[in-house]
């Protein structure tokens, strides 16, 4: 599959999740039997987090970037691949009325779901925009912090994603990412498997390549945690790990 075909596969899958429910792993069997709430608890979300905006928690993450993001009141935060808004709303609690969270997602259905959740739960400091994280609908140097949870692996051109992230961050800006990376290369048939592509595996890069692109875009970074046991828990032994990092301009 070429990049356009991969994007279409991912877009259709997440449209389906937004409208019908389910998870990114439906049909792929990689997430086990955990509910969205239980998966979030296993990733370190508190019970208060899980209960705060339950309709926004679709169980699509591989970490909890709001837990290690150094957010403060007044920050302007960008959530790359915001989905139904779960992490965006948790970030909004941290930045308060003086701050703002902008969520960007490629699927109109997810954006609408997030907007509906914002109204339902009374979040006025969150805005959701439809857009491609490879070409962000934001001005240069306009955000203080970027968060992203298991999304960058889905983008065919990760170099563009990192360049765009660098572009929109203010001087001194920070990015906190939880994402899937490969520990060894996948065979071609798995790289083109639609379920694994939408399930955050087939589009993942080798860890060294991922970090190299981050550096090439201009970022300094620090790896905060690596979880290779996620392979056994959720991905049927495939050579992947959940990587958590902080990057800065």
UniProtKB/Swiss-Prot annotation:
Result of altering residue 62 to S: Strong decrease in activity. Can still methylate monomethylarsenic
UniProt-reported outcome of changing residue 30 to S: No change in activity
Modes of activity regulation: Highly dependent on the characteristics of the thiol cofactors used, with some of them (coenzyme M, homocysteine, and dithiothreitol) more efficient than GSH.
GO terms classed as biological process: methylation; response to arsenic-containing substance
Highest taxon above the source species: Archaea
Effect the entry attributes to changing residue 194 to S: No change in activity
InterPro entries tied to this protein: Arsenite_MeTrfase-like, Methyltranfer_dom, SAM-dependent_MTases_sf
Catalytic activity: arsenic triglutathione + [thioredoxin]-dithiol + S-adenosyl-L-methionine + 2 H2O = methylarsonous acid + [thioredoxin]-disulfide + 3 glutathione + S-adenosyl-L-homocysteine + H(+); arsenic triglutathione + 2 [thioredoxin]-dithiol + 2 S-adenosyl-L-methionine + H2O = dimethylarsinous acid + 2 [thioredoxin]-disulfide + 3 glutathione + 2 S-adenosyl-L-homocysteine + 2 H(+); arsenic triglutathione + 3 [thioredoxin]-dithiol + 3 S-adenosyl-L-methionine = trimethylarsine + 3 [thioredoxin]-disulfide + 3 glutathione + 3 S-adenosyl-L-homocysteine + 3 H(+)
Outcome, altering residue 150 to S: Lack of activity
UniProt KW NADP keyword: no
Keyword annotations from UniProtKB, A to Z: Arsenical resistance, Methyltransferase, S-adenosyl-L-methionine, Transferase
One matching Pfam family: Methyltransf_31
Signal sequence, renumbered to the chain: none
EC number, UniProt record: 2.1.1.137
Family the entry assigns: Belongs to the methyltransferase superfamily. Arsenite methyltransferase family.
Protein name, per record: Arsenite methyltransferase
Gene behind the chain: arsM
């Amino acid at each position: 599959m070429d990049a356009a075909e991969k994007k279409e596969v991912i877009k259709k899958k997440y449209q389906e999740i937004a409208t019908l429910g389910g998870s990114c792993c439906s049909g792929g069997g990689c997430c086990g039997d955990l509910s969205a709430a239980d998966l979030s608890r296993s990733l370190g979300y508190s019970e208060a987090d899980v209960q705060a905006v339950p309709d926004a928690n679709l169980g699509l993450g591989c970490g909890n970037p709001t837990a290690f993001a150094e957010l403060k009141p007044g920050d302007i935060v960008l959530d790359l691949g915001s989905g139904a808004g779960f992490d965006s709303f948790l970030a909004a609690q941290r930045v308060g009325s003086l701050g703002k969270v902008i969520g960007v997602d490629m699927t109109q259905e997810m954006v609408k779901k997030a907007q509906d959740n914002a109204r339902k739960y009374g979040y006025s400091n969150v805005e959701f925009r439809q857009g491609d994280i490879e070409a962000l609908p934001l001005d240069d140097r306009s955000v203080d912090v970027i968060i992203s949870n298991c999304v960058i692996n889905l983008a065919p051109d990760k170099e563009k994603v990192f360049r765009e992230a660098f572009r929109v961050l203010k001087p001194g800006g920070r990015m906190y990412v939880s994402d899937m990376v490969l520990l060894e290369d996948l065979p071609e048939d798995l790289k083109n498997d639609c379920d694994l592509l939408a399930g955050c595996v087939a589009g993942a890069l080798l860890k060294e390549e991922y970090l190299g692109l981050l550096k090439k875009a201009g970022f300094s970074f620090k790896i905060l945690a690596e979880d290779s046991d996620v392979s056994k828990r959720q991905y049927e032994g495939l050579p992947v790990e959940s990587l958590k990092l902080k990057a800065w301009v």
